[in-house]
Amino acid sequence: VADDVPAIAICLGAQVAAEALGGSTAVPALGNDEVGVVELTITAAGESDPVFGAVAAEAIRAAHRAGIRTSDGTRFPVIVSHHDAVTHLPEAAILLASSDRSPVHTWRAGRLLAFQHHPESDPARVAYWRTRDALNDLAGTMDAASLKAARDALEVAAGRSAAPGAAGTHGATAADLPEAAASAGAAAREEAERVDPAIQAFGRTLARVLVRNVRA
């Protein structure tokens, strides 16, 4: 920031950047944690930001075309997965967007642009996160062998292991996932697929704007 170098910080990166610049975070951020799809509300500074404003506007247009609500062009969906959060911005930072549950979401400090959400994510990853969290919630009700088989099955389903029976998975399959965890992941994926046009528009536009700014 002090050297005026353009940079992007995402999720944990945004939290680390906030701490480094004099802000504060909560670990864990009880009441501010989020997983799945949430709506961001853009601030006036966000609308006029040379990067975020243009990217958010394109995401909102894509949402409108897909029939996704935008609350008169002030809100759009993003994908999140965080249990920690920035609670106070650095003094020099400007808030660009908030969610209902997590007030500090997108912000800028100099040429650093920080996102609490994951612009690079997709429905498959959302399903993985939500299934993983559901498994963690169920861990106390499962024996060690069943829990390991379920976690192995999740890794196989997510493509993090080559195939059932790959090293370390011991032949785990989708049948080893508890129904509650599998259902949670499926519901999260369905919700993410519904808003995917806006998610993809945000990611593509962000990439184009960043490349254009670097070349300028």
What label would you give each PLM region?
Residues 1-9:
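Flexible gly/pro-rich beta->alpha loop and the following alpha-helix that scaffold active-site loops
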Residues 8-9, 32, 194, 198:
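Generic, well-ordered alpha-helical segments
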Residues 9, 13, 18:
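Gly/Ala-rich beta-loop-alpha elbow adjacent to hydrolase catalytic centers
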Residues 20-21, 130:
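Hydrophobic aliphatic residues
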Residues 21-22, 214:
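A broad structural signal for alpha-helix termini and local helix breaks/kinks
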Residues 22-125:
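Pocket-forming structural segment of enzyme catalytic cores
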Residues 120-216:
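Acyltransferase
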